[in-house]
Curated annotation (Swiss-Prot):
The keyword Ubl conjugation applies. Ribosome biogenesis factor. Involved in nucleolar processing of pre-18S ribosomal RNA. Required for optimal pre-ribosomal RNA transcription by RNA polymerase I. Part of the small subunit (SSU) processome, first precursor of the small eukaryotic ribosomal subunit. During the assembly of the SSU processome in the nucleolus, many ribosome biogenesis factors, an RNA chaperone and ribosomal proteins associate with the nascent pre-rRNA and work in concert to generate RNA folding, modifications, rearrangements and cleavage as well as targeted degradation of pre-ribosomal RNA by the RNA exosome. Disulfide bonds: none annotated. The gene is UTP15. SMART domains: WD40 (SM00320). It comes from Homo sapiens (Human). Its main location: nucleus. It comes from the Eukaryota. This is U3 small nucleolar RNA-associated protein 15 homolog. The modification N-acetylalanine is found at residue 2. There is a cross-link at residue 249 (Glycyl lysine isopeptide (Lys-Gly) (interchain with G-Cter in SUMO2)).
Length: 518
């Protein structure tokens, strides 16, 4: 008796997105760690120096987290009201932050009480930063002003009053200690020079500006507001290079990768987009559970931290290369193992027997082998199989139809079982690779269960969904045929124009057949 031949499962190519280097790079993060804060996380900032701790501004507190810690290692809570925009100095030893009451406070990382307090703003301070010389702080507030402060003397040096609405974002140049950028809800981004009493450059963003970012070289400026991210060339007097519109809601934060080759933007649409700084195309995207307010990357992009409106802080760490574990050394076989059978002399009457390889059958193959056709169909109609590997279900249905027992396998089912079959048909009937097999199965089901339609509301609903799917597919096919007919007419018209013949008379009176080339 011949052995049982397993069912051949037809495989199909997986059609998906092209795997790029960016996809591999940005997907190489572990499962995110989520930390609950006391309020919306308005700012996240990494220390530029080891061990690369990061400051989280939420509600009336500033938490300092270690790079791999889930609990704050230090907390600054000397704020009467909401704190904003905690930012590290370049050496990582000082931290500056604004507050709702208009104050600006300077902290030493090793202490708790503020070292300096700058009073001068009359409304909430939403942006602060250190200048490149480390001895000055620039701040912007809801009183429409931008101020420059001297750290050693705790005094105000300059005040700029050129904005006509809230100043909500800003940054200082990393190269020039006299230059700093501010963005406002008056739709403008301005560059100020501490050596003058007015702005030296102004660009119109077109929307309330939520975030600005200056490239380390100082040649490019990025502004975010509304659904737009715009890149400006500062060396050409603020000329607009590109305007990006890849978010569906307001863009709230910007960040640059460690190499400077990738720009990241976070938005209220719960997505973080990664752009190439050469082509300015989206090369990757992250999805989050809530609207995003803040975003920061650690040194060498080892950690990405995102703050959200629901107070959740999402922390992703890059996967480390797996170390090869040293396995215990296997004992070497004894010498007699190697010489076993070496001295055996083959005889003419010896019979050589090959050990047959044992074949392991799948459960549905075992059922088919023993003619349990209904049970085999039940196994492949399990939701786990139909969702993950629908090609197995289709192959079993095809095999049952080839044997002529598909109707027997489908008959005699209760409401729950027939619902599983109809759900699979509804989900996969419109797929071209499965359609020939499933259309035949659908016809058999309709023939079997037509007399009992109307007895079960659940089954009736499934049949109506199947009917609607078939009608929609017929409409699609009709539209495609109409489109093909129109294309055939166009192609036929073009061919006639290319080969049009006209009769022209020659000098001897006989007609000449001449073609006009289009």
């Amino acid at each position: 008796m011949a052995g049982y031949k397993p069912v051949a499962i037809q495989t199909y190519p997986i059609l998906g997105e092209k795997i790029t280097q960016d996809t591999l790079y940005w997907n190489n993060y572990k499962t995110p760690v989520q930390i609950k804060e006391f309020g919306a996380v308005s700012k996240v900032d990494f220390s530029p120096q080891p061990p690369y701790n990061y400051a989280v501004t939420a509600s009336s507190r500033i938490h300092i987290y270690g790079r791999y810690s889930q609990e704050p290692i230090k907390t600054f809570s000397r704020f009467k009201d909401t704190a904003y925009c905690a930012t590290f100095r370049q050496d990582g030893r000082l931290l500056v932050a604004g507050s709702e009451d208009g104050g600006v406070q300077l902290f030493d990382i090793s202490g708790r009480a503020p070292l300096r307090q700058f009073e001068g703003h009359t409304k909430a301070v939403h942006t602060v930063d250190f200048t490149a010389d480390k001895y000055h702080v620039v701040s912007g507030a809801d009183d429409y002003t931008v101020k420059l402060w001297d750290i050693p003397n705790s005094k105000e040096i300059l005040t700029f009053k050129e904005h006509s609405d809230y100043v909500r974002c800003g940054c200082a140049s990393k190269l020039n200690p006299d230059l700093f950028i501010t963005g406002s809800y008056d739709h403008t981004v301005k560059m100020f020079d501490a050596r003058t009493s007015e702005s030296v450059l102004s660009v119109e963003h077109g929307q309330p500006v939520e975030s600005v970012l200056l490239f380390p070289s100082g040649g490019l400026l990025v502004s975010a507001g509304g659904r737009y991210v715009k890149v400006w060339d500062m060396l050409k007097g603020g000329q607009l290079l590109v305007s990006l519109k890849n978010h569906h809601k307001t863009v709230t934060c910007l960040c640059l990768s460690s190499s400077g080759q990738r720009l990241l933007s976070g938005s209220l649409d719960r997505k973080v987009k990664v752009y190439s700084t050469t082509s300015y195309k989206v090369v990757h995207s992250f999805d989050y559970a809530a609207s995003i307010l803040s975003l920061a990357l650690a040194h060498e992009d080892e950690t990405i931290v995102v703050g959200m409106t629901n107070g959740i802080l999402s922390v992703k760490h890059r996967k480390s290369e797996a170390k090869k574990e040293s396995l215990p050394r296997r004992r070497r076989p004894a010498y007699r193992t190697f010489i076993k059978g070496k001295n055996y002399m083959k005889q003419r009457d010896d019979i050589l027997i090959n050990r047959p390889a044992k074949k392991h059958l799948e459960l549905y193959d075992r059922d088919l082998k023993h003619f349990r056709i209904s049970k085999a169909l039940d196994r492949v109609l399990d939701p786990t199989c139909t969702i993950k590997t629908p090609e197995i279900t289709v192959s079993i249905i095809k095999e049952l139809n080839r044997r002529g027992v598909l109707a027997n396998a489908l008959a005699g089912r209760d409401e729950k079982e027939i619902s599983h079959v109809l759900n699979f048909l509804i989900r996969n009937l419109s797929q071209p690779r499965f359609a020939p097999v499933l259309i035949n199965a659908a016809e058999i089901i309709i023939d079997i269960y037509l007399p009992v339609i109307g007895q079960s509301p659940v089954v009736d609903k499934k049949f109506l969904l199947l009917q609607g799917l078939v009608e929609k597919e017929i409409d699609y096919q009709r539209e495609l045929l109409e489109t093909l007919g129109m294309m055939d007419m166009l192609f036929a018209t073009m061919r006639r124009k290319e080969g049009t013949s006209v009769l022209e008379h020659t000098s001897d009176g006989f007609p000449e057949n001449k073609k006009i080339e289009s």
